């Protein structure tokens, strides 16, 4: 069987790598992919993730047995709808269901309607009433652009000036709507589930690190590292999240005529009042995918085929140890990342997922985005895995790049 993964980052590299482990998979294509993936024998295809017609044609010509969608932009662009219309097997939500991520306001309205615990909020489509609400509520508050913002459309404001500036930025840009939420304090974690026809197959939870610098300092990013599982979040808490968040949301989407197929990401926070929902994503997270998927012992391709066919999938996960991943980013990220930096030589035996990379005229891998690659390691516990991973990472010639030195420290 041939598989097509849509997307170009570290998440898609992790998906492609996992699919290649399947004995029934002969070839894995990634569109558009990146040059780093070729080291693993993955075929990269020069088709944009937003070119639905070309992707459909490629899948037909290559007789692709399964397509898996990575990024939210492709989902919101209706790639799943295009494949379904062409009667091609694809795993991901259609455009209507992807609205759970595509609009923060829509997601909040679903949570409110179906009793899913989340922060109190208000939505505004112009600046003046939003500023008035700000004055009324005071800080801290969380300000979110309604639409897709590549993981960077959220500002946690602890002072009024930051809040006003965030609102001004959102309304002066392409976003015409903003959600203002109460600030929730607690321990954040990510719960991914495979979903189809109302059936839910949860994965081990992960915790990612959004801030750019050590000690959770600096601006928000798409994620600077992650680890899985999160042992200080109990099984009881995870069950509470499934019962109170994932199940009613999946059932609610069916009720709304927007049945969800694909990977549902619940961004959660354990507060003094129990689990609350921060956000939903309609796909795997990045970098969490790179630490969750290596823990799957079963055949991912077969599991997805079974889920789509309505059969019970085999999903067995590593029961001990921890998988840790650290993102290496180009200096200047998340605002103006340096492009064209030559990547260090990666020694054999280092598990790497490439993201923002391309090749120069000398066939060397160079940085072409903010988050450049992720190095992962699996070990007995967070502390020993951290030590192992950072010893290897610190030996690399990472001039012009930076990474956090404390990924996983919350678990120690």
Curated annotation (Swiss-Prot):
Q: Name the pathway.
A: Purine metabolism; IMP biosynthesis via de novo pathway; N(1)-(5-phospho-D-ribosyl)glycinamide from 5-phospho-alpha-D-ribose 1-diphosphate: step 2/2
UniProt source species: Lactococcus lactis subsp. lactis (strain IL1403)
Q: Which SMART domains does the entry mention?
A: GARS_A (SM01209), GARS_C (SM01210)
Name the enzyme's class.
ligase
E.C. designation(s): 6.3.4.13
Domain (ATP-grasp): residue spans on this chain? 108-309
* Name of this chain's protein: Phosphoribosylamine--glycine ligase
What HAMAP family does the record point to?
GARS (MF_00138)
């Amino acid at each position: 069987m041939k598989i097509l993964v849509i997307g170009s980052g570290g998440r898609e590299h992790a998906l492609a790598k996992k699919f290649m482990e399947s004995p029934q998979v002969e070839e894995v294509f990634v569109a558009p992919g990146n040059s780093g993936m070729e080291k693993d024998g993955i075929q990269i295809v020069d088709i944009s993730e937003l070119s639905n017609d070309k992707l459909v044609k490629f899948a037909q010509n290559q007789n692709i047995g399964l397509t898996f969608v990575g990024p939210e932009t492709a989902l919101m662009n209706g790639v799943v709808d295009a494949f379904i219309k062409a009667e091609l097997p694809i795993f991901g939500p259609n455009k209507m269901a992807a609205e759970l991520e595509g609009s923060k306001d829509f997601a909040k309205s679903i949570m409110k309607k179906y009793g899913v615990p989340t922060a109190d909020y208000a939505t505004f489509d112009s600046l003046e009433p939003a500023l008035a609400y700000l004055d009324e509520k005071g800080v801290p508050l969380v300000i979110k652009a309604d639409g897709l913002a590549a993981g960077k459309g959220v500002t946690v404001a602890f002072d009024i000036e930051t809040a006003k500036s965030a609102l001004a930025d959102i309304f002066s840009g392409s976003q015409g709507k903003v959600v203002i939420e109460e600030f929730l304090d607690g321990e954040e974690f990510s719960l991914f589930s495979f979903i189809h026809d109302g059936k839910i197959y949860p994965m081990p939870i992960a915790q990612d690190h959004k801030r750019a610098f050590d000690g959770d300092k600096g601006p928000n990013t798409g994620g600077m590292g992650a680890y899985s599982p999160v042992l200080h979040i109990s099984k009881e808490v995870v069950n509470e999240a499934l019962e109170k968040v994932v199940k009613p949301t999946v059932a609610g989407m069916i009720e709304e005529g927007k049945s969800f197929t694909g990977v549902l990401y619940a961004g959660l926070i354990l507060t003094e009042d129990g689990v609350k929902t921060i956000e939903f994503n309609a796909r795997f997270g990045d970098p969490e995918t790179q630490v969750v998927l290596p823990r799957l012992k079963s055949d991912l391709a077969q599991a997805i085929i079974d889920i789509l066919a309505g059969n019970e999938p085999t999903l067995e996960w590593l029961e001990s140890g921890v998988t840790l991943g650290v993102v290496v980013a180009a200096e200047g990220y998340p605002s103006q990342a340096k492009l064209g930096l030559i990547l260090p030589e990666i020694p054999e035996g280092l598990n790497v997922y490439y993201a923002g990379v391309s090749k120069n005229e000398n066939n060397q891998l160079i940085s072409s985005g903010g988050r450049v690659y992720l190095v992962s390691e699996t070990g007995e516990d967070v502390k020993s895995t951290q030590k192992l991973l950072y010893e290897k990472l610190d030996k690399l010639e990472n001039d012009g790049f930076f990474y956090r030195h404390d990924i996983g420290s919350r678990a120690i």
